[in-house]
């Protein structure tokens, strides 16, 4: 394969992996540990 193709596929895989991990962290089981700063702030 051409080196540009390999680089493009590599970058695409990294972007998709980061996006998937972000969605998993935001909506999956680890989201229980996330805190809402607006709920913690009392006025």
From Swiss-Prot:
A Pfam family of this chain: PsbN
Name listed for the protein in its UniProt record: Protein PsbN
A GO biological-process term: photosynthesis
Protein keywords: Membrane, Thylakoid, Transmembrane, Transmembrane helix
Organism: Picosynechococcus sp. (strain ATCC 27264 / PCC 7002 / PR-6)
Function noted in UniProt: May play a role in photosystem I and II biogenesis.
The keyword Thylakoid belongs to this UniProt entry's keyword annotation: yes
Transmembrane segments: 7-27
Membrane topology: Single-pass membrane protein
Any single GO CC term annotated in Swiss-Prot or TrEMBL for this entry: plasma membrane-derived thylakoid membrane
InterPro entries: PSII_PsbN
């Amino acid at each position: 394969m051409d080196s540009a193709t390999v680089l493009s596929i590599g970058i695409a895989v990294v972007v998709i992996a980061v996006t998937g991990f972000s969605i998993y962290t935001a909506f999956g089981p680890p989201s229980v540990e996330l805190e809402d700063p607006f709920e913690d702030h009392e006025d």
